[in-house]
Amino acid sequence: MITSLSNSTIVAIRKLHRLKDRRATGLFLAEGLRVVGQALDSGAEIRQLIICPDLLISEYGQQLVDRARKLGVDCLEVNEPVFASLARKDTPQGIAAVIAQRWQVLESLTPQEGELWVGLQAVQNPGNLGTILRTCDAVGATRLLLLDDCTDPYDPAAVKASMGSIFTVTLTKTHAEAFRVWHTGHEEMVIVGTSDHADEDYAQTVYPQTCLLLMGSERQGLPDEYIQLCTKMVRIPMEGSCDSLNLAVATGIILYQIYNQRRNIFQSAGQQ
């Protein structure tokens, strides 16, 4: 059992809370029963499992440890002070994992008929990003494109907010010019953008079956270079004194409109 806070392995794991170390290693730290369980279920590449026996008291937790050991995962037992130095949860559950990040290169992606993707341009809040990942999973959106200078989806706050969806939605990083070139060869993926100034109400829009919902940053919205790529621009009408919605909320509203529209189409087809 590791009891030293200065143990070299523990120090290296602790550094994964920092962006530069996650980028350098291609790894991230996931904490908690649910997230570790979903990592195992999804076939994520788990490099190390960190266990605190005094905190990991549930039968499900022990089942996760047994599964990891059968897969040959390196399992490290640590005491409570050491685990607390790694944890970000208010009430640590005694289990965490060091996991390899998963990315797909934009140029390798080919849209399949009926797929729903989401693109986020310069999103800065990791909690918003994690929440959007969770919503993508819920509505069946298969890919999330992070455009330009987005926050890290493997930030601990994003991983926590995703509730395990970090393992089920494919992630891609790119920038405006590369995205424009890619879309020139994949125009079957219809881009729907959002703007407060758009004429079309999101609830009155017929969304294409193969669709990418493109959302701008929390403060600036979509730049003109992205608006020019959009086939449709929609807005969410608002009353009251506020002039904008939280990005994760706005994304969720439109995604569920798309989802419900698709559900109604499938139900209607099934009744014919």
Question: Where are the predicted features?
Answer:
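Active-site/ligand-binding-proximal alpha/beta "capping" segment
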Residues: V192-G240
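Amphipathic alpha-helical repeat scaffolds
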Residues: G32, Q124-I132, L245-A250
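Structured adenosyl-cofactor binding patch, chiefly the S-adenosyl-L-methionine
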Residues: A97, T135-V139, P153-I166, D224-Q272
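N-terminal positively charged helical leader segments and presequences
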Residues: M1-R88, E188, Q267, Q271-Q272
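Glycine- and other small-residue-rich loops at beta-strand/loop junctions that grip anionic moieties
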Residues: I2, F28, Q121-A122, L147-D148, ...
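Glycine/charged-rich beta-loop-alpha catalytic/anionic-binding loops adjacent to active sites
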Residues: L19, T110-V118, L229-M238
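RNA substrate-binding interface of SAM-dependent RNA methyltransferases
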Residues: D41, R67-K70, N79-P81, W103-A198
